[in-house]
């Protein structure tokens, strides 16, 4: 049985927890929760019978095999650092943190030294296995075009000085590189960092707000020595968190299931 602890107890964590309590993932269980808002951890604890912790230190001190981060970019460094030093592998959902090259390299080196694993799920996009394979050749271009409902980008749109209600037709709200994208849209464009890590090539990113769209659309174009990879996924948003695609949560569930089973399909 794979014993899991979760950092961050919002809508996505709740969805993943329900899956881990079901027969869909029979060989893994959540045993402990932590959130900066203790009441959120307590609520999930009461619903599941797992422990609620008052700190990450308390969480990683438990008898766990795996820590799942689904909190925020700002929580990644502490979560990964303390998990690895406590002899635990860790899954990172807020992979936007790895746009910070120094942080990525420091945590990579630490995990290597301690013989622990840092897992990055494929998230809300398709084709990551093929792109990883292609990265062993030569990649010449990586482009991500993400289109989301206006309300799914509301906070980021406001931060840009725009009014969501005034967007009445599809509008490009960002065009630039992966580093700029995750800086301006830290809760909406983690997929750009997953794509860049998989391809080992800094993705070019375009973000479109569409008032007529009800799904989160991610279109990928990768060119390289193996040929051209094109994918398009139209994801339903998480019911309680429209900033996140439901597929992002399901990709974590699948990763945990894979880690708990003797045979793994895909790279």
Curated annotation (Swiss-Prot):
Protein's name in the database: L-aspartate dehydrogenase
Pathway participation: Cofactor biosynthesis; NAD(+) biosynthesis; iminoaspartate from L-aspartate (dehydrogenase route): step 1/1
Listed GO biological process terms: NAD biosynthetic process
Physiological role: Specifically catalyzes the NAD or NADP-dependent dehydrogenation of L-aspartate to iminoaspartate.
Catalytic site positions: 218
EC id: 1.4.1.21
Note: The iminoaspartate product is unstable in aqueous solution and can decompose to oxaloacetate and ammonia.
Source organism per UniProt: Methanococcus vannielii (strain ATCC 35089 / DSM 1224 / JCM 13029 / OCM 148 / SB)
């Amino acid at each position: 049985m794979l014993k899991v602890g979760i950092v961050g107890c919002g809508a996505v964590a709740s969805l993943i927890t329900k899956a881990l309590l079901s027969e869909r993932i029979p060989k893994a269980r959540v045993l402990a929760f932590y959130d900066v808002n203790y009441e959120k951890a307590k609520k999930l604890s009461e619903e599941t019978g797992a422990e609620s912790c008052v700190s990450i230190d308390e969480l990683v001190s438990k008898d766990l095999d795996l820590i799942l981060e689904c909190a925020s970019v700002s929580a990644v460094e502490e979560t990964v650092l303390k998990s690895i030093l406590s002899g635990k592998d860790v899954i990172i959902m807020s992979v936007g943190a790895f746009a910070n090259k120094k942080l990525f390299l420091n945590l990579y080196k630490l995990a290597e030294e301690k013989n622990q694993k840092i897992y990055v799920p494929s998230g809300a996009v398709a084709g990551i296995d093929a792109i990883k394979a292609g990265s062993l050749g030569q990649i010449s271009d990586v482009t991500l075009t993400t289109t989301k409902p206006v309300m799914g980008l509301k906070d980021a749109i406001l931060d840009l000085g725009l009014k969501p209600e005034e967007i009445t037709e599809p509008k490009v709200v960002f065009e630039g590189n992966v580093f700029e994208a995750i800086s301006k849209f830290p809760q909406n464009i983690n997929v750009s960092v997953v794509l860049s890590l998989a391809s080992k090539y800094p993705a070019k990113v375009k973000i479109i707000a569409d008032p007529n769209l009800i799904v989160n659309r991610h279109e990928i174009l990768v060119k390289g020595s193996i040929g051209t990879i094109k994918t398009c996924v139209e994801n339903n948003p998480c019911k309680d968190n429209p900033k996140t695609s439901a597929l992002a949560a399901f990709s974590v569930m699948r990763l945990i299931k894979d880690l708990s089973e003797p045979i793994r399909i895909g790279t």
